[in-house]
């Protein structure tokens, strides 16, 4: 058995270089919610040095709120936003002799795509039109996966190590009780359950079937590095290899 470990990087959190030694896929901010050209380039160099699969992490144009504020934008504007950001990061990757592998929307753009089909279709169309060989990362069991597959893209169903789940398989909204698992042991056990047993316990105690192909580790917490090391060790002890597998 194998699993991909991904993290959102290039967001100015200071752990990037060390985290890249522990993960298999990096989602690099494209400057619209965090980072800038210099940060993007440096993160790309670190990722290539660690042989980590590189992906674009496009967002709404929302640096003030780290891309976590929902915006009502026309689908064509979102299409242009995403296309622009993918192209910017791809330029950095190509200049260093690498190859862009995937795209994962960020923050509110990701969460809205779970429930807004037209928004999701615009994101997926931008990915497909830029490069139909790119892999699309989306929330496991959600319409993001269905829409991307219908467009002919390869997908990876994403689960979250430290986020709470609703009974319908969506993530508990940030800022509400149960949204984040502060206890590392809870997050570790949840990850193992999703990867090995293909199920997750929702906040109401019910078990929800889930397909895990890539696990997101948040890189902006105070204990991000320690948790990444623990999760690698725990998965390794279960005989689960860490690989991007694109």
UniProtKB/Swiss-Prot annotation:
Any GO MF annotation of the entry: 5-oxoprolinase (ATP-hydrolyzing) activity
EC numbers on record: 3.5.2.9
Keyword Nucleotide-binding: yes
Matching Pfam families: LamB_YcsF
Assembly notes: Forms a complex composed of PxpA, PxpB and PxpC.
The encoding gene: pxpA
Reaction it catalyzes: 5-oxo-L-proline + ATP + 2 H2O = L-glutamate + ADP + phosphate + H(+)
Transmembrane segments: none
GO terms under biological process: carbohydrate metabolic process
Annotated protein name in UniProt: 5-oxoprolinase subunit A
Keyword Transmembrane: no
UniProtKB keywords: ATP-binding, Hydrolase, Nucleotide-binding
InterPro entries per the UniProt record, alphabetical: Glyco_hydro/deAcase_b/a-brl (IPR011330), LamB/YcsF/PxpA-like (IPR005501)
Gene3D superfamilies: Glycoside hydrolase/deacetylase
Family: Belongs to the LamB/PxpA family.
Cited function: Catalyzes the cleavage of 5-oxoproline to form L-glutamate coupled to the hydrolysis of ATP to ADP and inorganic phosphate.
